[in-house]
UniProtKB/Swiss-Prot annotation:
Keywords: 4Fe-4S, Electron transport, Iron, Iron-sulfur, Metal-binding, Molybdenum, Nitrate assimilation, Oxidoreductase, Periplasm, Signal, Transport. Catalytic subunit of the periplasmic nitrate reductase complex NapAB. Receives electrons from NapB and catalyzes the reduction of nitrate to nitrite. Gene3D superfamilies: 2.40.40.20, 3.30.200.210, 3.40.50.740, Dimethylsulfoxide Reductase, domain 2. Belongs to the prokaryotic molybdopterin-containing oxidoreductase family. NasA/NapA/NarB subfamily. It comes from the Bacteria. InterPro entries: Asp_de-COase-like_dom_sf (IPR009010), CT_Nitrate-R-NapA-like (IPR041957), MoPterin_dinucl-bd_dom (IPR006657), Mopterin_OxRdtase (IPR006656), Mopterin_OxRdtase_4Fe-4S_dom (IPR006963), MopterinOxRdtase_cofactor_BS (IPR027467), Periplasm_NO3_reductase_lsu (IPR010051), Prok_molybdopt-oxidoreductase (IPR050123). It catalyses: 2 Fe(II)-[cytochrome] + nitrate + 2 H(+) = 2 Fe(III)-[cytochrome] + nitrite + H2O. PROSITE patterns: 4FE4S_MOW_BIS_MGD (PS51669), MOLYBDOPTERIN_PROK_1 (PS00551), TAT (PS51318). Binds 1 [4Fe-4S] cluster. Its cofactor is [4Fe-4S] cluster; Mo-bis(molybdopterin guanine dinucleotide). Substrate binds at residue 794. This is Periplasmic nitrate reductase. [4Fe-4S] cluster binds at residues 48, 51, 55, 83.
Length: 829
């Protein structure tokens, strides 16, 4: 069908309205694919490839290439807007150094760890991989192999990879890069509510009276959502915006109140607010008595370091997540020391400002939306910080109603939909199930048609532990997909690079571009990107969105899904399962892992005829792969509070927020009348907990593992900028974005620069015990640190700033703290 873009947009609007009303439209109006007569550009919808906001874009293709993108005016998330990265989506797939065929390190015609990258066929690549995997399995067993995935995997890619590792290879050594960004949020949700992901949604932006950003720079990291806050603030004079951070950034420009606090002291600020609420009789007793219980967190739990690290040895209760029941009076006593005087002293924030913030939470007539992302989660006490903010909302009853929302934002397009909901973490299964729970394993084994005892009960190696196990030669075969951890992860020189180059190990990296991670590998597999494949993402508000493949891949590049499924064909079940399992499931004897995982009568039950647009993966395997995987995965959540709609529905809408029950999405969870799982008459029902009550968890301030001293006298904070996404793999290959911000710089306070004899543009050496980098100084611009702190973004592959970061983690979530470590700054002569 041919139509103008205007007609296309009108048809989309009509289709959306008709879907709500249950009306069937003529094909010309219902079709979500269109072509412009004037330009011969075909348009289709897709979620943006970048952050976790989940904007929808219209993608224009011509002659097999993406030639244009624009904001989707029918999308409820972004309403036609895109940030600057989204506007240049059409260029991310066409960098000059795009990888087009497998590359294996070779010397004298065969694989060699010290050889040069040499083009090989897919058969040679997979044969080499399979040989290494089989040798490792035979010698050391399934714990010697591992996989590091991504919050950028599609739902189907993550599901297939997790199934291959946990059911096929029987190894839980799979973890996503979301471990570095969302793990503390996950554990915070699970401890407080017993179920993951926000209870609110983006509609809260249009209802809140006060916005509190806990360490988040939404103006640059979630700019489209920031426009909704901006619109709310500028059109409603009573609305207040509060921004808390360790340095000044662009979000402060809109703020009514800005709070620059000392690193780690957010713990003290949050506890002060809880104390203020109690002391000023602002507790919502009806809510607290009916819907909460009180717990005390175990303290002095260490920093997730190696067991022989002196800092870890000092901990009295290393890695303990235990909690004990306490009364309200005991909780009150635990926060009493956090007076305004004490909180001000610890944080550096003026007393009157702290009281101003606390009053907004305490006022029963003020609807408050708390927002956070990496500033809170990348924290050695990130789980505690998540809990402390929930405490404030629970004490006041400001939760799960329009405008009252503690909202954890995500940084990747499917950190929620894939990493969390699918369960690609080393300890998880789909729909909030975990490998350590025998009932959960039994559910997974039933859905996957596995004999009892297939899935190992012990969690696998998490991301940071994977690096250590590679370093120590315990983990020997390792597959990295859809991330650039050699640039993004911490302590590169100390753990990761030695692990990748360990002669005992074989490292495979699937990526579209020759990243720092790819260059450290032994085998590079070229990967299809974004709309070169069909897929689905899940965004920060529980919205699942799907898209069709719209262009072919470049060269011999293949999707991560194709790679996982095709690789599984290289293994007979006798090579991956012990005899006792095969004896329980003799039907799998002589079969391949592919037969067991994907040709199981469930994944392969949808014929190609059901695919409205045929995609390369489905064409290759002979059935509608994406639908089969999605529908099998959805079985985990339906009826368990994670209900998803039928797969085909997602291609007709701009996403739906789960749980989707009887065709209706859920905006506010846990609230009677909004959430179908909330019991009638309950008011609120936190059904993730057996008694339907959320937990208010007491946790104190505890110091970071390292602090500045006489030698390393400055704090270092790393992060992002508006124009680049994560390590810049895609955005630095977009000419306009590269020209806008070509290099990372060291943002420093002018007085700190002056004290070191530095001027703007001077080159400095930033160093600590873990390494050093050279970077130029910036004393002006968007980021303005206080004295004693520098900020350096990590998008620049020439400046591997994260190699200075200690691989300390929150002991409960295993998430790294990228926001504070001591360094020294010296001028390069």
């Amino acid at each position: 069908m041919k139509m103008t873009r205007r007609a296309f947009v009108k048809a989309n609007a009509a289709a959306s309205a008709a879907a709500v009303a249950g009306i069937t439209l003529p094909a010309s109006a219902a079709n979500l694919i269109a072509s412009s007569d004037q330009t011969k550009i075909t348009w289709d919808k897709a979620p943006c490839r970048f952050c976790g906001t989940g904007c929808s874009v219209l993608v224009g293709t011509q002659n097999g290439k993406v030639v244009a993108t624009q904001g989707d005016p029918e999308a409820p998330v972004n309403k036609g807007l895109n940030c600057i990265k989204g506007y240049f989506l059409s260029k991310i797939m066409y960098g000059q150094d795009r990888l087009t065929q497998p590359l294996l390190r070779m010397k004298d015609g065969k694989y060699d760890k010290e050889g040069d990258f040499t083009p090989v066929s897919w058969d040679v690549a997979f044969d080499t991989m399979a040989e290494k995997w089989k040798a490792s399995l035979a010698k050391k067993g399934p714990t010697s192999i591992g996989m590091f995935g991504s919050g950028q995997w599609t739902v189907m890619e993550g599901y297939a990879a997790a199934k291959m590792m946990k059911a096929g290879f029987r190894s839980n050594n799979i973890d996503p890069n979301a471990r570095h960004c969302m793990a503390s949020a996950v554990v915070g949700f699970m401890r407080t509510f017993g179920i993951d992901e926000p209870m609110g949604c983006y509609d809260d932006f249009e209802h809140a009276d006060s916005f509190v950003l806990w360490g988040s720079n939404m103006a640059e990291m979630h700019p489209v959502l920031w426009t909704r806050i901006t619109d709310r603030r500028l059109s409603h004079p009573h609305v207040k915006v509060n921004v808390l951070s360790t340095y000044y950034h662009r979000s402060f420009e809109l703020a009514d109140s800005g709070y620059i606090f000392k690193p780690q002291s957010d713990l003290a600020i949050a506890n002060f607010i809880a104390n203020y609420i109690i002391q000023n009789d602002a507790v919502n007793w009806d809510f607290v008595n009916k819907h909460t219980n009180f717990k005390q967190a175990t303290t002095d739990i260490g920093y997730g370091l190696r067991d022989d690290d002196p800092l870890q040895k000092q901990a009295k209760n290393p890695n303990s997540g235990n909690m004990t029941s306490i009364s309200f009076e005991e909780y009150k006593k635990s926060v009493a020391p956090y007076t305004v005087e004490k909180a001000s002293e610890m944080s550096g924030v003026a007393q009157d400002k702290l009281i101003e913030l606390a009053k907004q939470y305490a006022d029963p007539n003020t609807k408050v939306m708390s927002l956070w992302t990496m500033g809170m989660n990348q924290h050695t006490r990130g789980v505690w910080m998540n809990s402390l903010v929930y405490n404030i909302h629970l004490l006041t009853g400001k939760i799960a109603t329009p405008g009252n929302s503690p909202f954890s934002l995500t940084g990747q397009p499917s950190a929620c939909g894939t990493a969390r909901e699918v369960g690609t973490f080393a300890h998880r299964l789909p729909a909030d199930m975990v490998v350590a729970n025998p009932k959960h394993r039994a559910i997974a084994e039933k859905i996957w048609k596995l004999p009892e005892g297939t899935i190992p009960p012990k969690p696998g190696f998490h991301a940071v532990l994977q690096d250590r196990m590679l370093h120590d030669g315990v983990l020997n075969c390792y597959w990295v997909q859809c991330n650039n951890n050699m640039q993004a992860g911490p302590n590169i020189n100390g753990e990761r690079l030695p692990g990748y180059r360990n002669p005992e190990n074989f490292i495979v990296v699937s990526d579209p571009y020759p990243t720092a991670t790819a260059q450290a590998a032994d085998l590079i597999l070229p990967t299809a990107m974004w709309i070169e494949k069909e897929g689905a993402y899940g965004n920060a508000e529980r919205r699942t969105q799907a898209w069709y493949q719209q262009v072919g891949t470049v060269g011999e590049a293949k999707s991560d899904l194709w790679q996982v499924m095709e690789f599984s064909k290289r293994f007979k079940m006798e090579e991956v399962w012990p005899e006792e399992l095969l004896a329980k499931a003799p039907q799998y004897r002589g079969k391949t892992m592919y037969d067991m995982l994907f040709a199981n009568g469930q994944v392969d039950k949808f014929p190609l005829s059901e695919a409205r647009q045929l995609n390369d993966d489905s064409h290759h395997f002979g059935f509608y792969v994406q639908k089969g995987l999605f529908e099998e995965y959805a079985e985990f959540g339906r009826g368990h509070g994670h209900d998803l709609a039928p797969y085909d529905v997602y291609h007709t809408v701009r996403g739906l927020r789960w749980p989707v029950v009887d065709g209706k999405e859920t905006l506010w969870r846990y609230k009677e009348g909004s959430d179908p799982y909330a019991k009638k008459g309950s008011g609120w029902d936190f059904y993730g907990k057996p008694d339907g009550k959320a937990l208010i968890i007491s946790a104190p301030y505890e110091a970071p593992p390292e602090s500045p001293d006489a030698e390393y006298d400055m704090w270092l904070c790393t992060g992002r900028v508006l124009e680049h996404w994560h390590t810049g793999t895609m955005t630095r290959r977009v000419p306009e974005l590269y020209k806008a911000v070509p290099d990372a710089v060291c943002y420093i306070h002018p007085e700190d620069a002056k004290a070191r004899g530095l001027r703007r543009g001077d080159e400095v050496l930033i160093s600590n015990k873990r390494g050093e980098v050279r970077v130029r100084v910036e004393t002006r611009g968007r980021n303005r640190p206080p004295q004693g702190l520098v900020f350096v973004p990590f998008f620049d592959a020439r400046i591997l700033i994260n190699k200075l970061i200690l691989d300390a983690t929150d002991p409960l979530s295993k998430q790294t703290d990228f926001k504070k470590c001591p360094v020294k700054i010296t001028k390069v002569a």
